[in-house]
Amino acid sequence: FDSALNHAGVANFNLIRLSSVIPPKSKIIYTNPPIKKIEGNWGDKLFVVMAEQRVDTPNTEAWAGIGWVQDKNTGKGLFVEHEGNSEKKVRSDITQSLEALMATRNVNFGEIQMKVVGRSCKHEPVCALVVAVYQSQSWEKSISENLN
């Protein structure tokens, strides 16, 4: 898991998982790992939506994915995250989840997009990881606010 976090470029943050609602005016920027432009310092809070699947049995696979839809005009949207032992299952779960979420909202979100990754366990444990980063936040303000 730590190796996957390092590969993604988020290992030195305290990850705070969010539910999957993309705020209005958000811009999704897709990048290959590692993420190079995350502002913040060692130990800062990092708000994320994350999918992870770990396996430690030889000849098994770990798959993780995040799917999203986003209104082009407002920037608001939805993320979903799924994990499993096959790419097909993860992609299917992402599609079904987003279709269900879109059916309950009166918004034209456009096409489903997704990022899915997989790792094969040969001998050592592996972790498939996909991370959507919102923003980082220092602890300094939080600590000083709590002391006053």
Regions found by a protein language model. Give the residues of each.
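Helix-coil modules at protein/domain termini and other flexible surface or pore-lining loops
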Residues: 1-148
